[in-house]
């Protein structure tokens, strides 16, 4: 019974409404490890899946979870009932590499502020 208390059953809700899990994780499991699980278990038939842990953001109880936090740190004081499954929402944000940044921004394209003055009347 003590083992169940020190674990949290988590399912990961994807953007299309499908789920990965649920699966039991010990309280000492880090958010980074949860993200590794999402990357490893991402359905192969789904497009735009995460390539690395850096592409994944996990949201629980309205908060974006930090990689160094543990499952125990992320427990909500309200709503974690014995045997209840915790749903974490998965957001995929692919990291833009320096090469891609340069490709998107044409060389010599500097932002220029332009002011235009229009006069509609006898005095200007």
Swiss-Prot record:
The keyword Transport does not apply. It is a lipid-anchor. GO terms for cellular component: plasma membrane. Acylated protein. Probably modified with palmitate. Gene3D superfamilies: Phosphatidylinositol 3-kinase Catalytic Subunit, Chain A, domain 1. The keyword Cell membrane applies. Heat stable and remains soluble at temperatures exceeding 90 degrees Celsius. Residues 8-74 form the Ubiquitin-like domain. It is found in: Cell membrane. Keywords: Cell membrane, Lipoprotein, Membrane, Palmitate. This is Membrane-anchored ubiquitin-fold protein 2. Ubiquitous, but three fold higher expression in stamens. Changing residue 119 to S: Loss of membrane localization. It comes from Arabidopsis thaliana. Changing residue 124 to S: Loss of membrane localization. The gene is MUB2. Signal peptide: none annotated. A lipid is attached at residues 115, 117, 119, 124 (S-palmitoyl cysteine). Changing residue 117 to S: No effect on localization. Induction: Not induced by pathogens, cycloheximide and ozone treatment. Its main location: membrane. InterPro entries: MUB, Ubiquitin-like_domsf, UBL3-like, UBL3-like_ubiquitin_dom. May serve as docking site to facilitate the association of other proteins to the plasma membrane.
């Amino acid at each position: 019974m003590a083992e169940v208390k020190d674990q949290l059953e988590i399912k990961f809700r994807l953007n299309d409404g499908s789920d990965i899990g649920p699966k039991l994780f010990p309280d000492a499991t880090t958010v980074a490890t949860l993200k590794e699980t999402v990357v490893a278990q991402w359905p192969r038939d789904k497009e735009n899946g995460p390539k690395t842990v850096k592409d994944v953001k996990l949201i629980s109880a309205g908060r974006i979870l930090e990689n160094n936090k543990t499952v125990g740190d992320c427990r909500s004081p309200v709503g974690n009932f014995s045997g209840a499954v915790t749903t974490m929402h998965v957001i995929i944000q692919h990291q833009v590499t320096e090469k891609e940044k340069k490709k998107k921004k044409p060389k010599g394209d500097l932002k220029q502020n332009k002011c235009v003055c229009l006069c509609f009347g006898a005095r200007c």
